[in-house]
């Protein structure tokens, strides 16, 4: 399974990348806007830090607007993946871009049919949202399982990026269900390395060692 960082904070990306567990980065307009910096500059900086797919999202609403934006964004770096919203216009854009060899990440997927349509249109990645589905009482894990089953049954090349990840339990569950990737907010990465028993165990080891060395 691959781990992507769901942030545009360059310093956080740089620090977490040192752990050796980061395979890519995802961003969206909300994440970029929080940084208050130029979109292209931020994406290019991230590409220099992480050697893997870096998702950058279009903001146009029509297929024509998305395609024009995507062609420009794709020129920024070979690792850039263009994020496209799951709409009819987004599917049109994905179809054109996939034929041009531009990698796409179709986002805001909440149903099996949406994921299937995105894969049929040629999406490189599809991004079902875990936390947001839970918010409305839906079962995000069944969605992940169903999408993975369809990929395996029909041989689609698309990979599942489990998005809207909020807890370590989310990561653990989607890993067991076969999501290819979990994209994780930077604060959660630190929490995933921690457990009170680990902290207490290390403290005991150090105390025992200090007593032994006296």
Swiss-Prot record:
Question: What cellular component GO annotations does this protein have?
Answer: cytoplasm
* InterPro entries, A to Z: Aldolase_TIM, TAL/FSA, Transaldolase_3B, Transaldolase_3B/F6P_aldolase, Transaldolase_AS, TSA/FSA_arc/bac
What biological process terms from GO does the record include?
carbohydrate metabolic process; pentose-phosphate shunt
GO MF annotations for this entry? aldehyde-lyase activity; transaldolase activity
What is the protein named? Answer: Probable transaldolase
Point out the gene that encodes the protein.
tal
Q: Which reaction does it catalyse?
A: D-sedoheptulose 7-phosphate + D-glyceraldehyde 3-phosphate = D-erythrose 4-phosphate + beta-D-fructose 6-phosphate
- Could you tell me where this protein is found in the cell? Cytoplasm
Instruction: Cite a single Pfam family from the UniProt record.
Output: TAL_FSA
What family name appears in the similarity comment? Belongs to the transaldolase family. Type 3B subfamily.
Q: What is its EC number?
A: 2.2.1.2
Q: What exactly does this protein do?
A: Transaldolase is important for the balance of metabolites in the pentose-phosphate pathway.
Active site location: 83
| NCBIfam families the UniProt entry points to | fsa_talC_mipB
From the record, give the cysteines joined by S-S bonds.
Answer: none
Highest taxon of source: Bacteria
- Write out the entry's keywords from A to Z: Cytoplasm, Pentose shunt, Schiff base, Transferase
